[in-house]
Each structure stands twice: as C-alpha cells, then as structure tokens.
Amino acid sequence: MQDAITAVINTADVQGKYLDSSIIEKLKGYFQTGELRVRAAATIAANAAGIIKDAVAKSLLYSDITRPGGNMYTTRRYAACIRDLDYYLRYATYSMLAGDPSILDERVLNGLKETYNSLGVPIGATIQSIQAMKEVTSSLVGSEAGKEMGIYFDYICSGLS
C-alpha cells in the first residue's frame, strides 16, 4: 500500500530527481485536503452499517436478485454480499485517506472479477450496489469529500468491469 506522498517520492527517487514544482503542488493539494479526508473517514466509520444498509435498500433489496432463485436469496449469500460491501467501503476509505488506490488493487481487486465469475456472482448487481454506496456516502460526508470518495468507488467498479 502506498499513499500520495510515498508515490511521488518513489517516482522522483527512481528518476534520481529532486521534487519539482508540479510534484510540490500535488503534495500541497494532498495536505490541504487532509482534514477533510480525516473528517470524512470518521463519518464513514461511525455510519458504516447504515451506509451499507441504505445502499442495499437502494440497489438490491427489492430486485430479482433477492427473490427465490436469485443470487442473494439464501441468508448465506446475502451475508456474503453485505460482507463484500463492507470490504469495499472500508478499503475505499483507506484509499481516500492515503490519496492512492494501490491498496484497492492489492487487497480488493486482485483476482476478484475472476472469483466472482467462477462463483456466479452477478458483477452488474455488485457495481450497482457500489454506485448506490457512493451516493449514500456522498450524502453523509458532503459533496467535496463525496467526490473524493467517489474516485475510489469508481476505481473498484472499473476494476470489476
């Protein structure tokens, strides 16, 4: 896992260069939004169960997927879906705090699409629920922090597409 600071320093180090003005500006932006990211993470942590509940209600609860024969019909499958949504929310929050999506590749997306396909998990419904989670989260943390979180929710969706 990297953060925005490590990523730019590693890049400059590999190139054997000092930090130039564009890198310094990128770091300034990261530090200027630090308090916003920390407040958003605290709000998400305090409301995680509600975010997931609302996202499921908004995207999956009354669809064919939860009816008999649907992929979330049994309690076990439903619980697995909720567990996965919790992972996505938690790791998107970590990425937002770090300002870097690498943890999503390492801990969430690496092999996930293939695993879902082999288990018959509907990727479209998963993406729909992540998008709903993005909307619910944004309404809680505000538009600026919601936009930042949206980057990482979209990254997960893109990795699953």
Swiss-Prot record:
Q: Where in the cell is it found?
A: Plastid, Chloroplast thylakoid membrane
Q: Which UniProt keywords apply?
A: Antenna complex, Bile pigment, Chloroplast, Chromophore, Electron transport, Membrane, Methylation, Photosynthesis, Phycobilisome, Plastid, Thylakoid, Transport
The protein's matches in InterPro entries, at most eight in alphabetical order, are given as: Allophycocyanin_b (IPR006245), Globin-like_sf (IPR009050), Phycobilisome_asu/bsu (IPR012128), Phycobilisome_asu/bsu_sf (IPR038719)
Q: Where does (2R,3E)-phycocyanobilin bind?
A: C81
Biological-process GO terms, alphabetical: photosynthesis
What does the record say about its membrane topology? Peripheral membrane protein
Question: Residues bearing N4-methylasparagine?
Answer: N71
Top-level taxonomic group:
Eukaryota
**Keyword Lipid biosynthesis, does the record have it?**
no
Q: Which family does it belong to?
A: Belongs to the phycobiliprotein family.
Q: How does this protein assemble?
A: Heterodimer of an alpha and a beta chain.
Other remarks on this protein? Although originally identified as Cyanidium caldarium, these sequences derive from Galdieria sulphuraria.
Q: Please state what the protein is called.
A: Allophycocyanin beta chain
| Annotated source species | Galdieria sulphuraria (Red alga)
Q: What is the lineage of its organism?
A: Eukaryota, Rhodophyta, Bangiophyceae, Galdieriales, Galdieriaceae
